[in-house]
Amino acid sequence: YFGKEFISQNECQVVAVESGQKGNFYQKMLGVQFTSVGCTFCPKLSQSLENIQASQPNRLAVVSFHKHLNGQDPMYIEWADKLYNKMQELYEGDGGLPAFYLNGHGNQIVSEQYKIEAAMKKEMTSYPTMCGVAIRSKLEGDQVTVTARVKSETEAKYRYLIYLVEDGITKHFQAGADGLYTHNNVVRAVLANNLFGERLNKGNALVSGQEYTAERTATLGKDWVSENMRVVVAVMASNDGGSTYYVTNCNECKLGESADYLYK
């Protein structure tokens, strides 16, 4: 991935399982936020996202990428620029910060809460999910192992992305904020090599009624606080033959813990 540590390229496993559930999978959306400690208006977007998460619990997971602006951002990772530039290229954007993309596609939203809420409502209507996501994560010392588990209700091809994020970072200044500021959802690493995720089942379609798993490993950075970290797994689909991908469902858990499939 874009960072200091090596990520293993483990083979995907296929396990036949009985569904045991009725109805569709619950749809959880991914908010991709671009921010910077040097951005005066960025706290407004963070507040909008916090408001939405409070009013719609468990509907939106947020991953926050820090970029350099008006100086160096200590939480910057290389993936931030690569993804930001690609999003600006593919979708309408103004080239500035803050920037927000729901489920990794669609036009850029700056910070307006009502626009994000409208986009979420439209997403559920226009892009309903047909798959579920579960997570197993293990932490031994500074070694992390994450297993993404995916089941689909239809025969379809998917990709996946695994993020390691950290909450509760208070040691860094934030422009536009008074006094002590808490940085949450900070992306420490993306456990992938492709901006649009890694292929599930070697790029072959998933069969309905079977579970597919993919594993990634990483080494924690020395200044990361593991107790404040989470794992976010996003599963991506394409409606244009693989030219672009969007997040069709996601899930999250505390680092070292697990999360089961979510159903309506």
What does each model-identified segment do?
Residues 1-19:
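N-terminal targeting signals for export/organelle localization
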Residues 9-11, 41-43, 141-143, 213:
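A short linear-motif detector with a strong N-terminal bias
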